[in-house]
Amino acid sequence: MLITFEGIDGAGKSTQVVKLKRHLQERGREVLTLREPGGTPVAEQIRELLLESHNDITSIAELLLFSASRAELMEKIIVPALEDGCDVILDRFFDSTTAYQGYGRGLNLDMLAEINRIASHGIRPDITFYLDLTPEDALLRKFSEKSLPLAFESEELDRMENSGLEFYQRVRAGYHAILEAEPQRIIMIDALLTPQEIHRKILSALQALEVPEDGKR
């Protein structure tokens, strides 16, 4: 089973990935957790290139770098793991490309869909959890309210995070559009809930999907 987590930076995806991995492992399932971009030596190098705050990268180059990282990760890690019967939990997948490079950067959505299909080997998630958070709340999680006006001048932000508030508002709107198009796959959860409340909603959705918890398939 391929489970993906989506949301803008600061939504709490990483926390929920860890919680879900622990839950499934305790029930006898083999679980692999990965993040995008990254996961292989080459993909990690691409990640550093993409997130380095001083790098000036065009929108098309950014798209192709993210996609190259995904193609590398899919072929070398994810596809073999799925074929071996392992559950794979991903912190970001192709929905991030659609939201960030499509809605955020304004690239053609049909072009993105084809690139996403190629890079992901045509594999789609069994279920996606989208943790919904406003860009303003995301920034407040990283900065105090007093320092919020200076957030985008901070060296604490990586290149993607430094794209500005309006960019992240477009990204969030993009996620909502993706959700509207695929409500059967994507589960939206309020990221302002407590981590445990979010975890319970995730488990409830998986139970509704009839995911076995004893390691049997």
UniProtKB/Swiss-Prot annotation:
Enzyme class: transferase
Protein name: Thymidylate kinase
Organism (species): Chlorobaculum parvum (strain DSM 263 / NCIMB 8327)
CC terms in the record's Gene Ontology section: cytosol
Matches recorded under CDD domains: TMPK
Organism ancestry: Bacteria, Pseudomonadati, Chlorobiota, Chlorobiia, Chlorobiales
GO biological process, one term: dTTP biosynthetic process
Keywords: ATP-binding, Kinase, Nucleotide biosynthesis, Nucleotide-binding, Transferase
GO molecular function terms attached to this record: ATP binding; dTMP kinase activity
Catalytic reactions of this protein: dTMP + ATP = dTDP + ADP
NCBIfam families: DTMP_kinase
InterPro entries, per the entry: P-loop_NTPase, Thymidylate_kin-like_dom, Thymidylate_kin_CS, Thymidylate_kinase
Family, per entry: Belongs to the thymidylate kinase family.
The EC number(s) this enzyme carries: 2.7.4.9
Binding locations of ATP: G7, I8, D9, G10, A11, G12, K13, S14
Protein function: Phosphorylation of dTMP to form dTDP in both de novo and salvage pathways of dTTP synthesis.
Tree of life domain: Bacteria
Pfam families: Thymidylate_kin
